[in-house]
């Protein structure tokens, strides 16, 4: 009997040893396949990092670029003489702005006014503010609806803008790398439509198909939470169709969405994740880090991680396991510092640092952007990285540029762009309630391959980012009337003709001013 037990243990031991060898071989093969997929690109970019921020119109941050006021006591900004022309606010618009009966000109907000109210940026309200191309109804329709908002004149605040003495880092990145002054939200509306457009070029396909003021004709027009997320509350929806994650998976290309506060702080009695991490913004107000409706992949069952499960190991970050490519922001750094940077990474700041008016601000946002970019520039992969800074919506902030309307809609309840309460007439190649393009948003590309001190005037939108991913890794289009098929290219912001062009730029997170620049 003892001999039999010994034999079984011996056999078991051998089996376990063989199993371990097989598993190690599988992991090695997975890593080798991931490396191979990263290396097969159609440009010099092998790693793409998309930093997706919140609620800023182009004029709100770049109205007077590259000319800053430079008052005493604020970080100084001096532009390069080589700075090209930018479509910002003209002297006429600054002093004689057409905005209906309110007669309020755009005005500068200083660093002491960094905490502002949240403007009205709902799908119908933004269209009404643009008033069929007259752009004269922002105060009437896009001003804050918060009765407690008294900052900078309450309704007038929507006309406010920051300059290079507050958003100093972004202005310095624009000086050193490439920016666009002609990039737009894919459609009008708030955060969730913007996030869905970023990953799928599509806001149609929601279930339920109609929820008052939230989903219309199967199209998302507001901010419901994702159904497949333990941390969601209130109105929840699911999305159908493909997104950029599903087609990256089909080609075995590593990727991930990394969001602040995604890691659970505890679990409920029935095992549901609790997202309870909190930070204070510069005003001392506590904000929960995780915002469910800012996490677009959680609307899709195929890419959701409902219980916020961690990756099984660092080596699996970017690959398919129980995390389903949805991670805490800390997992991005765990992967990067262990030589496992995914080919495509989407980074989402915690709530207090995402730039969203009402609970975040440009100074907290600058801390996140600069700390993140400084750190990425020190990675060994920097030589083949492109960082894209993009935004989900405008928050309703004034911008003087009328977007080209490439997708029309005629929902009489929610489409308000034209005097007839329409956004043109829906056609075969468009779903209802997808009026767009929407407001103009900032877009910057930071990379060794960025053109330097460059301003791109090509028309692009949020789906131009997924078009770059599709083209660079040979994925094909998403289909189902996704806007990726219509998107302009961001390639003009980069130059791959004769090697890297732009040197590293290290900034101070507090001031946004340059601390060190070096080649390589």
Predicted ranges, named:
Residues 1-4:
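Positively charged n-region of N-terminal signal peptides that target proteins for export
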Residues 11-25:
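Bacterial N-terminal signal peptides
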Residues 28-520:
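N-terminal pro-sequences and low-complexity stem/linker regions of secreted or lumenal proteins
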């Amino acid at each position: 009997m003892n001999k039999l037990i010994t034999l079984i243990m011996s056999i078991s031991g051998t089996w376990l040893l063989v199993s371990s060898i097989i598993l190690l071989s599988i992991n090695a093969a997975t890593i080798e396949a991931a490396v191979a997929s990263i290396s097969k690109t159609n440009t010099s970019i092998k790693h793409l990092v998309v930093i997706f921020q919140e609620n800023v119109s182009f004029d709100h941050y770049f109205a007077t670029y590259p000319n800053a006021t430079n008052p005493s006591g604020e970080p100084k900004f001096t532009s390069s003489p080589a700075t090209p022309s930018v479509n910002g606010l003209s002297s006429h618009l600054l002093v004689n702005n057409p905005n209906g009966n309110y007669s309020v000109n755009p005005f500068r907000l200083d660093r002491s006014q960094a905490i502002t109210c949240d403007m009205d940026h709902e799908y119908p309200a933004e269209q009404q503010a643009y008033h069929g191309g007259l752009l004269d109804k922002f105060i009437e329709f896009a001003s804050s609806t918060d009765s407690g908002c008294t900052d900078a004149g309450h309704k007038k605040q929507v006309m406010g803008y920051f300059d290079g003495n507050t958003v100093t880092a972004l202005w310095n990145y624009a000086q050193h790398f490439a920016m666009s002054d002609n990039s737009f939200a894919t459609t009008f509306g708030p955060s969730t439509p913007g996030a869905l457009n970023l990953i799928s070029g599509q806001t149609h396909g929601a279930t339920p198909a109609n929820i008052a003021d939230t989903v219309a004709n199967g199209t998302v027009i507001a901010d419901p939470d994702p159904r497949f997320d333990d941390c969601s509350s209130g109105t929840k929806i699911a999305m159908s169709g493909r997104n950029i994650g599903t087609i990256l998976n089909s080609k075995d290309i590593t990727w991930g969405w990394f969001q602040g506060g995604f890691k659970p702080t505890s679990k409920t009695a029935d095992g549901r994740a609790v997202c309870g991490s909190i930070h204070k913004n510069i005003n001392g107000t506590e904000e929960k880090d995780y915002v469910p409706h800012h996490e677009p992949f959680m609307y899709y069952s195929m890419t959701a991680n409902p219980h916020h499960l961690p990756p099984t190991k660092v080596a699996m970050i970017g690959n398919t396991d129980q995390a389903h490519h949805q991670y805490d922001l800390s997992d991005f750094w765990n992967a990067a510092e262990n030589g496992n940077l995914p080919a495509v990474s989407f980074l989402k700041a915690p709530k207090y640092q995402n730039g969203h008016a009402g609970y975040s601000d440009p100074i907290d946002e600058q801390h996140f952007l600069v700390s993140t970019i400084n750190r990425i520039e020190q990675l060994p992969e920097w030589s083949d990285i492109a960082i894209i800074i993009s935004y989900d919506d405008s928050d309703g902030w004034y911008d003087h540029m009328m977007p080209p309307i490439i997708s029309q809609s005629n929902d009489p309840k929610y489409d308000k762009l034209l005097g007839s309460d329409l956004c043109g007439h829906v056609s075969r190649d468009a779903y209802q309630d997808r009026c767009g393009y929407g407001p103009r948003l900032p877009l910057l590309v930071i990379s060794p391959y960025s053109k330097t001190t460059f301003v791109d005037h090509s028309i692009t939108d949020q789906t131009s980012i997924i078009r770059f991913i599709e083209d660079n890794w040979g994925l094909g289009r998403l289909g189902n009337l996704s806007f990726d098929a219509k998107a302009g290219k961001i390639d003009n912001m980069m130059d791959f003709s004769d090697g890297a062009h732009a040197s590293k730029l290290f900034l101070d997170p507090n001031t946004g001013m340059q601390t060190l620049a070096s080649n390589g």
